[in-house]
Design a protein with these regions (language model features):
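N-terminal secretory signal peptides and thylakoid transit peptides that target proteins
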Residues: 1-19
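Cleavable N-terminal signal peptides
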Residues: 18-20, 29-30
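C-terminal segment of N-terminal export signals and the immediately downstream linker at the start
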Residues: 25-43
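Active-site acidic/histidine clusters and adjacent loop/turn architecture
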Residues: 39-93
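Stable alpha-helical elements in mature extracytoplasmic
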Residues: 77-85, 123, 140-144
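Sec/Tat-exported extracytoplasmic proteins
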Residues: 85-93, 131, 148-152
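Mid-length scaffold segments of soluble, non-membrane domains
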Residues: 92-97, 103-135
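Catalytic cores and adjacent binding grooves of peptidoglycan-active enzymes
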Residues: 116-122, 134-198
């Protein structure tokens, strides 16, 4: 069903999710979300906060093939899902130009108990972070909502927050969440199927 939108989405196929970043997984303690508020070691969604400069970091600058853009995000399944999301936004909502995507950011005390903390774990990104509120037309919002449905609640949008930020998209699940793993696998399989079709 998801493959039937725009003709130029066919172009996505060869670039999807054969992620240029290597696949690494990390498993925080089961109570990561609670620990987040105590020691700032985890972002709000339960992923370890990291710094790309660290030798053991799983945050890398990942090319989002097909749209000539890149951003720093967590490699592996997070990259699989978020890169797919960016391409859907590019081809189905509005063209994304180089430099319009922002990924990992260093943790801040102000953001630690908000969805913005997910940027510090490499599990979130912002598309046009400087754009004004209510920049999307109603039909574009409808398409964004359709795109998000395919991720089965694993990806959340800042446009739905009380203090909305339409630029923000983030993983809304912990690393060990079975649905997160299922959705990542679904996206991976679908993308390879697209490559074979074309």
């Amino acid at each position: 069903v998801f493959l039937k939108y725009l003709d130029r989405r066919q172009f996505i196929a060869g670039s999807l999710t054969v992620a240029i970043c290597s696949v690494v997984s990390s498993q925080p303690p089961a109570q990561a979300s609670q620990l987040n508020q105590d020691n700032y070691e985890f972002s709000l969604n339960g992923w370890p906060v990291q710094n790309p400069a660290d030798e053991v970091s799983t945050i890398e600058k990942c090319d989002i093939s097909g749209i000539s853009s890149s951003c720093e995000m967590r490699i592996g399944d997070v990259n699989i899902i978020l890169s797919d999301l960016v391409r859907q936004m590019h081809y189905r909502v509005k063209d994304i130009k180089p430099g319009e995507i922002s990924g990992w950011k260093a943790k801040t005390e102000e953001a630690i108990q908000t969805p913005y903390s997910n940027l510090s774990s490499g599990t979130a990104l912002q598309i046009r972070p400087s754009m004004p509120i209510d920049s999307y037309f109603a039909y574009e919002i409808k398409i964004i909502q359709e795109v998000l449905k395919d991720y089965e609640g694993i990806v959340s949008w800042g446009g739905d927050m009380t203090n909305k930020d339409e630029s923000l998209f983030y993983i809304n699940a912990s690393p060990e969440d079975p649905l997160f793993l299922e959705v990542a696998e679904k996206v991976r399989v679908r993308n390879f199927a697209d490559v074979r079709i074309n």
